[in-house]
């Protein structure tokens, strides 16, 4: 699944305030090229929308470059970027994520957050810090193994005569 600009355009109503993008996408492995994202950005800008960009799988792409939506021209101030440590750093279950967004948005989020969450567990915060400081070798090892498995499944499907859209 890849969102097309014309499909987005036709789904926008006067009450639309934001678009949710989830890419790279699990389980399809779909990701979006810079050109495709720029076309989405044009629609977003034309309709004065925000984008909630769930990029939790940003490190788990193969054979293509991941393009982060807020890196596009004029999109940083329109994007609420969601990320986390569970996928790339194998910290599933730790439930430690982050948001990058304009202050107007993060200020409003904090007003709600303070009443529904105490804080992330201290151990998870220290683990995430350690992952950022010293975990890249482990990430690369996991990515290599995941890619080996991905290639095995792709080859097996093709050997059996099955068509497929290669996951990235």
Residue ranges and their predicted role:
Residues 77-147, 151-156, 160:
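Conserved core segment of the aminotransferase class I/II
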Residues 23, 55:
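Walker B catalytic acidic pair
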Residues 24-27, 134-135:
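A short, flexible beta-alpha/helix-coil linker loop
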Residues 1-15, 27-50, 57-91, 104:
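Active-site pre-lysine segment of PLP-dependent enzymes
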Residues 17-19:
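Short SAM/SAH-binding signature in class I
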Residues 163-168:
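Short beta-strand
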